[in-house]
Amino acid sequence: MKALLDLFKQVQQPEVFDAIKIGLASPDKIRSWSFGEVKKPETINYRTFKPERDGLFCAKIFGPIKDYECLCGKYKRLKHRGVICEKCGVEVTLAKVRRERMGHIELASPVAHIWFLKSLPSRLGMVLDMTLRDIERVLYFEAYVVIDPGMTPLKARQIMTEEDYYNKVEEYGDEFRAEMGAEGVRELLRAINIDEQVEMLRTELKNTGSEAKIKKYAKRLKVLEAFQRSGIKPDWMVLEVLPVLPPELRPLVPLDGGRFATSDLNDLYRRVINRNNRLKRLLELKAPEIIVRNEKRMLQEAVDSLLDNGRRGKAMTGANKRPLKSLADMIKGKGGRFRQNLLGKRVDYSGRSVIVVGPTLKLHQCGLPKLMALELFKPFIFNKLEVMGVATTIKAAKKEVENQTPVVWDILEEVIREHPVMLNRAPTLHRLGIQAFEPVLIEGKAIQLHPLVCAAFNADFDGDQMAVHVPLSLEAQMEARTLMLASNNILFPANGDPSIVPSQDIVLGLYYATREAVNAKGEGLTFTGVSEALRAYENKEVELASRVNVRITEMVHNEDKSDGAPAFVPKISLYATTVGRAILSEILPPGLPFSVLNKPLKKKEISRLINTAFRKCGLRETVIFADQLMQSGFRLATRAGISICVDDMLVPPQKETIVGDAAKKVKEYDRQYMSGLVTSQERYNNVVDIWSATSEAVGKAMMEQLSTEPVTDRDGNETRQESFNSIYMMADSGARGSAVQIRQLAGMRGLMAKPDGSIIETPITANFREGLNVLQYFISTHGARKGLADTALKTANSGYLTRRLVDVTQDLVVVEDDCGTSNGVAMKALVEGGEVVEALRDRILGRVTVADVVNPESQETLYETGTLLDEDAVEEIERLGIDEVRVRTPLTCETRYGLCAACYGRDLGRGSSVNVGEAVGVIAAQSIGEPGTQLTMRTFHIGGAASRAAVASSVEAKSNGTVRFTATMRYVTNAKGEQIVISRSGEAMITDDHGRERERHKVPYGATLLQLDGAQIKAGTQLATWDPMTRPIITEYGGTVKFENVEEGVTVAKQIDDVTGLSTLVVIDVKRRGSQASKTVRPQVKLLDANGEEVKIPNTEHSVQIGFQVGALITVKDGQQVQVGEVLARIPTESQKTRDITGGLPRVAELFEARSPKDAGILAEVTGTTSFGKDTKGKQRLVITDLEGNQHEFLIAKEKQVLVHDGQVVNKGEMIVDGPADPHDILRLQGVEALSRYIVDEVQDVYRLQGVKINDKHIEVIVRQMLRRVQITDNGDTRFIPGEQVERSDMLDENDRMIAEDKRPATYENVLLGITKASLSTDSFISAASFQETTRVLTEAAIMGKRDDLRGLKENVIVGRLIPAGTGLAFHKARKSKELSDRERFDQIAAEESFEFGTPETPAAEQQHSGE
């Protein structure tokens, strides 16, 4: 019987669908869903526990409580399936229909849906063109609204108070109609003729000129067009029928003691039903208007609370005074349906336990506790037991397993063989946080983890726990084995470096074994082979570090490539090496030369070694090699027995004198301050400077002493060798600790910061070895506590950044091999402050070329367009001195939905070209988000110590080569023959013999050039010098000075220098000027030529006028002759405010959110000539006249620093007012490539500061997603509205259609959206709703009748399908093509049938819809 029942409960085939549509339900639709009206607020009878009839749990409406059994018990059993009991009215069927059958409530008075009323911008307001305030007054019965003005002078939609209404009624009688409440609003909505309105708005839009109106009309048009397109009637925003959720979804559970636990929804529904019934009764009794009105208002409020409690007014509360959880609360937020149940679920067949180290495991194995394995693989074991005939039934099998008989353990071994399990450590910040391993059964209760995968999991063994998951199906096991097995994931997807790098003991052991010592035992011996050296070592004839000569056999690549020839051939050579290195040479994989081991192995070296092995010998050899490295490291570290003691921390003897000298200097500054020679701030800055220098000096002295030790060599001479001090070795090898930490142990702790980030000027002169006194200890608690508080904040912030990044990129998948674009970006080495920060080879590695790479010497093509550049290629490019390579980038990829493999290039986690189906968006988001917790949270104040060091006064070349100036460099020659720079953004480059850029330096305005373009120079040559303390104002033309508006006491003041007695004129601040007139003028200089005429700017009618900024010291006199390049005035740089620099995480978030910085710099909108117009109050007016003679004005605050002067020619996009750049301006004026360069470089700066490596392409992928919307400038013949923002792919599809129909396509400009905004504005409403602002997203989608094509990953996870990435992409493609071929077959059969019988064919349209 049970089996029979199960037969009927067979799982229905899941519906196959391509898209999900959302809309507003009409009242008839709601009634059609319903299985009956809920008339009573009763739930269940507390004595019988049976649901009340017509109540919220009524069995007649919602279905039976027990399977195939009616309520009164007349019909039981399967044979009555589908009968409706005549006594209790219940249909005999499965009880689970109570999860899907809905009811409804007929409302006595219509009610407005709060989402469309209150969710901003109010949709009701938009449609009716009324303010939200007015609509609310009407809905909540505070005012009347005119519905039909008739022949009266009243206007439709006019609001009037009750008094007004009665007056008008007296005046006009029943000429006009006005209503209150939702009825009135519904009438208005019904009266709207959408087509008419849309036409009207479109014409208005074309004819109006005011910005505000255009904005308003466009918004309203968008909403109305949405209604028009979706076929949803606006009056459906007012409910007449309220659907009731199926009872199983709002359960009522009896607790012991006769109480019930219930879902809040039941409470909310009860209120609605109570008020509705009361209203019905009042209407039947023809109660006074005021009572009815009050009841209607209460009904409206009850429905509001049910839909979205707390959205308007005070939230309804239950018996325990907490707000009730409404329908809206059920779906939104972290605990809502989307994020709690759809995007993250609890998983069957999983377990978790503490992890311990498993040094004996292979890389692809993990130790699984026996009991855990038994529990996880239970069904498999039951099956095996039945198949083998040990147990006859599942029940018997269960018993066997519970008794843990020997046969069960044998079977477990068998089941587990070749069946990978997945291990996961939370937080899973990148894809290496879940990896598959083959389980090895172990005793105990802890999971054993291989030491080399700890780096990827970020795991340690101080009590970390990990979860185990079992892939059940064969496909899942296959994917786990091929894609997720730990030995297949040995590179970080973020940067392509190996993730299986040894750390701690392993590094220490390898380092110790490969160090060399002077005059160790047996130095200078020669051995015939490694085995002989090993024998000598084991007989204590030599030490590990002894320098010896050994014959070593290496396996090298065979030159003979013929068939049957071995791939590797042995090559024997004698090496001068150490015993330890020779012994290690045994584990070298074939194909790697011994030279890679013939040096002290530090952590970085080992990482490089594994990387080389992977590139040269392939995955399998590398994994084996890494495992052997680990085993050797552990063994050697154990044998070495390195330990530390207090005496290892050597305090340098010079420390006392260094600290003493510093204290003297500080005293001197204190004395100067007391006598008033320096200000308090200067004294503080200097003191901090002194102490940080002292700290450095002590640290340096300590490291010098620690890092070397004296020894006697074989010939009896005293020499020094690298120290074998344990602490030094740990730090030097990279096993543990760093120079900074050693400095605190044995040098001095140095300066500490207060919680607000400012530095305490009293340093801690002691170190941990000497011990801190009470005051010093107290000072250091500050920093420690701030560190802990910061860490907690950082984790949350970093997690939120990752979530936003994943959300914006989740639908970006590689969908084709090549989009065929010819666009790309030019990649150069990244040079900052004259140093190469990132070499060209690192930036183009793994990219596809978009133009031929040409050998500069022979001009022949090295690499064709479309070549994927690998390690050999980039090395060749570097060797030839090519300084710029054009490569493909995700930014310019022309694939519509997704990316192509060529634009992305190499998959960094696999080391080969990226596969179609790779979810590159999510990988990019994880790569940027994962190191987020390592970034700081602080904002740097530049001022004091930091800026002191930053003042440079000259720039010198770091390498030999030729000087080259950029196109923006402009200079004049003054009377002394010196070249004075007059450009603001000029840069000097040094290029080598091949013309490749080696370094690049900014040369500021007013600098004196010492070398000119094309000069051949040696390293160390000065290129330019300048005065760091002042900024000059320089004339580009000669002539006689004529002052304008330079009046003493009005615009300038005379200052007399105390020391020299010379007087200078200083331009005074606007605020300090006396008369009103003098506030608007600007002191400036004009130049006169020999005839007394004003000197004009060449080729223009403008006279030369040079304005003086506030605070400028004027150094020339009226009437003085000046030559070209002479200084007219100087501005002391001290007066510049120190500005905060946002660093760390907040900076990254700021960049990705595309926020405009406050006090942003201003860029020139056009190319043209600058001049200053009439100043307004507190602002100066800068005018740029373009080449056609059109003028563009900028108003600039007086305190801002203008970087241009009168008559200067500026290029479009050039900075004209100093300040941080605004990414939106860069995009508008300089284009996508400049924007991407800006964002990539800025983000990389933050990460580089923390020593984190992230590949550029990940950031480019995010920028692509930030640019995925465009703004329509001219709509042509398309359906778009000018100024509307639309998805780029939509716009391109629409334009393609227009071009195909010979109509005018739309023109557009790029828009940069921050990641939050970009996620919310995605086409998929499911994805947007599950991210943030759920209510707003769903409201908008419902009105527009949006359809979600389920293109992204999130949408598919939510509806429970395979994601369209990886193996899922192929699955979906196959499914779609199968559907197509099925449909074609169906059409063909239909055609044949109709041909035979002469029946008309079904119209194609119907067939199209049947698929949706």
Curated annotation (Swiss-Prot):
Catalytic activity field: RNA(n) + a ribonucleoside 5'-triphosphate = RNA(n+1) + diphosphate
Cofactor binding description: Binds 1 Mg(2+) ion per subunit. Binds 2 Zn(2+) ions per subunit.
UniProt: Zn(2+) 2 binding residues: 819, 893, 900, 903
Keyword Disulfide bond: no
Binding of Zn(2+) 1, residues: 70, 72, 85, 88
GO molecular function: DNA binding; DNA-directed RNA polymerase activity; magnesium ion binding; zinc ion binding
Cofactor: Mg(2+); Zn(2+)
Enzyme Commission (EC) number: 2.7.7.6
UniProt cross-references to CDD domains, sorted A to Z: RNAP_beta'_C (cd02655), RNAP_beta'_N (cd01609)
GO biological process: DNA-templated transcription
Binding-site list for Mg(2+): 460, 462, 464
The entry's keywords: DNA-directed RNA polymerase, Magnesium, Metal-binding, Nucleotidyltransferase, Transcription, Transferase, Zinc
GO CC annotations, alphabetized: DNA-directed RNA polymerase complex
Stored InterPro entries: DNA-dir_RpoC_beta_prime (IPR045867), DNA-dir_RpoC_beta_prime_bact (IPR012754), RNA_pol_asu (IPR000722), RNA_pol_N (IPR006592), RNA_pol_Rpb1_1 (IPR007080), RNA_pol_Rpb1_3 (IPR007066), RNA_pol_Rpb1_3_sf (IPR042102), RNA_pol_Rpb1_4 (IPR007083)
Region described as Disordered: spans on this chain: 1391-1412
Quaternary organization: The RNAP catalytic core consists of 2 alpha, 1 beta, 1 beta' and 1 omega subunit. When a sigma factor is associated with the core the holoenzyme is formed, which can initiate transcription.
Family indicated by similarity: Belongs to the RNA polymerase beta' chain family.
Function: DNA-dependent RNA polymerase catalyzes the transcription of DNA into RNA using the four ribonucleoside triphosphates as substrates.
Protein name: DNA-directed RNA polymerase subunit beta'
Organism: Paraburkholderia xenovorans (strain LB400)
